[in-house]
């Protein structure tokens, strides 16, 4: 059910084709496409915000309180362009970035990174071991359901490290995935119509004084 909302977008983890010819009609067509894309973006993000959960935390039978996300001001959204960490530090920014990656079918990267962040905060050796195995089976091993793109040597090292799990088991892989997102997905997110719309300041309404 959840994945069905994202099947209308491109699958190649790259920007959409912007070619739509030239001339007034083509310009009108492009503007219509942009409005449609922006509307789809807002629908996807709204759905994602209502149904998102931390990938590092297991789901329980109890109903969890819905997370509250406050839409940023244009000035706050513009800060996300200064550094990738600024985007990740914002709850709304992180949720928007996750929705963006999901629309490009690349969400495994941010989900792995978040799972590693949760993993590093774990204190109990028993929980550390069980979480390490889950991250490995979800993201690392061959044909994992959310397999990330890392080299064979790093995968082998992780397989050895999780036998006696420590908080640094996934450090190398997490750094590589972070770098991949920072240099690839992050710039495309900043160019997306959704992000550009967040940065736009609403037009000021001026009222003319009544003639006396």
UniProtKB/Swiss-Prot annotation:
Domain called RGS: residue spans: 83-199
Entry-linked SMART domains: RGS (SM00315)
Entries under InterPro entries matching the protein: RGS, RGS2_RGS, RGS_sf, RGS_subdom1/3, RGS_subdomain_2
Maturation and modification: Phosphorylated by protein kinase C. Phosphorylation by PRKG1 leads to activation of RGS2 activity.
Main subcellular location: membrane
PROSITE patterns: RGS
Region Necessary to inhibit protein synthesis: start-end pairs: 79-116
Pfam families reported in the protein's UniProt record: RGS
Location relative to the cell: Cell membrane; Cytoplasm; Nucleus, Nucleolus
Ranges where the record places region Disordered: 11-33, 48-69
Keywords: Cell cycle, Cell membrane, Cytoplasm, GTPase activation, Membrane, Nucleus, Phosphoprotein, Signal transduction inhibitor, Translation regulation
Location of the region described as Necessary for membrane association in the Swiss-Prot/TrEMBL record: 32-66
Entry-linked CDD domains: RGS_RGS2 (cd08709)
Function recorded in the entry: Regulates G protein-coupled receptor signaling cascades. Inhibits signal transduction by increasing the GTPase activity of G protein alpha subunits, thereby driving them into their inactive GDP-bound form. It is involved in the negative regulation of the angiotensin-activated signaling pathway. Plays a role in the regulation of blood pressure in response to signaling via G protein-coupled receptors and GNAQ. Plays a role in regulating the constriction and relaxation of vascular smooth muscle. Binds EIF2B5 and blocks its activity, thereby inhibiting the translation of mRNA into protein.
Protein name: Regulator of G-protein signaling 2
Species assigned in the record: Sus scrofa
Gene designation per UniProt: RGS2
